[in-house]
Design a protein with these regions (language model features):
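Short, charged/polar "capping" segments at the starts of alpha-helices
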Residues: 10-15, 35-37, 74-76, 154-156, ...
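Phosphate-coordination loops involved in phosphoryl transfer and adenosine-cofactor binding
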Residues: 64, 119-123, 195
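Rossmann-like adenosine-cofactor binding region
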Residues: 54-58, 152-222
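NAD(P)-binding Rossmann-fold cofactor-contacting core
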Residues: 141-156
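Structural motif
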Residues: 5-9, 29-31, 48-51, 70, ...
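Phosphate/diphosphate ligand-binding glycine-rich loop within oxidoreductases
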Residues: 44-116
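Glycine-rich adenosine-cofactor-binding loop
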Residues: 7, 93, 119-140
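N-terminal glycine-/charge-rich "phosphate-binding" loop or analogous flexible N-terminal tail
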Residues: 1-43
Length: 222
């Protein structure tokens, strides 16, 4: 089997050596800035990070059938690739959940320390996946009141989030579907919200940044 691997995926070489008969693999490492269609023409499996955009142009006439991403989420895949049954696609869902939650909690702690917010204020969580669930669990352990909104799971209401002084965003990004998240936080949301701080560790496109700039809200993004 011919493997095409991003050379910045940590520990990949070490893990491959632990696989029985690993010497049967034909391996080529690539720099994510230089990956082209020609590279994919001689590979059966592709291992990437979120820095690689996977689309029809990249995979045209390629024998690749397996794609593994060392990051969570599918934002770097074009929909026509995701919907093509030719490809088996795997992502590392939740792999960075702890790191993201630690960053969010650090932001909240700093805001409390600087007296931008008080510790007993209500927090809102948008998106109840791996990160949202872990954040909620820790907030419960810290006795910090919070509300959750995830329309796909039928949890909460967006209007409830408007009452929260701090909103932390962990939703997946989409422009289509039953509940598109593109510019979910916009002038309509902000106009009726008592929110003072928005922490966005998800995709930037979930925020209408012009609306944020025209508001008094403190916006934190990683």
């Amino acid at each position: 089997m011919r493997l095409l691997i991003d050379n910045k995926i940590p520990f990949f070489r070490e893990y491959l050596k632990k696989i029985k008969n690993h010497d049967q693999f034909i391996i080529k490492y690539f720099d994510d800035n230089n990956l082209e269609n020609d590279d994919c023409l001689n590979a059966d499996a592709l291992f990437i990070r979120s820095t690689t955009r996977v689309n029809s142009e990249l995979l045209s006439n390629s024998p690749i059938k397996f794609i593994g991403s060392a990051t969570s989420g599918y934002d770097h895949f074009d929909n026509n690739i995701l919907n093509n049954s030719k490809y088996s696609i795997y992502v590392a869902s939740g792999c960075n959940a702890s790191a993201v939650v630690n960053w969010v909690l650090s932001c909240i702690g700093l805001l409390v320390f600087k007296k931008v917010i008080s510790r007993n204020r209500m927090l809102g969580i948008i998106g109840y996946g791996n990160v949202g669930k872990l954040l909620s669990k820790i907030l419960k352990n810290l006795n910090i009141d919070h509300k959750i909104y995830d329309p796909y799971l039928g949890i909460g209401n967006i209007n409830d989030i408007k009452d929260c002084e701090v909103v932390s965003i962990h939703a997946s990004y989409s422009k289509t579907g039953k509940f598109p998240s593109h510019e979910l936080i916009n002038s309509d949301f902000l106009g009726g919200a008592s929110t003072k701080v928005i922490i966005n560790s998800a995709r930037g496109e979930i925020i209408d940044e012009d609306s944020i700039l025209n508001s008094d809200i403190l916006y934190l993004s990683d």
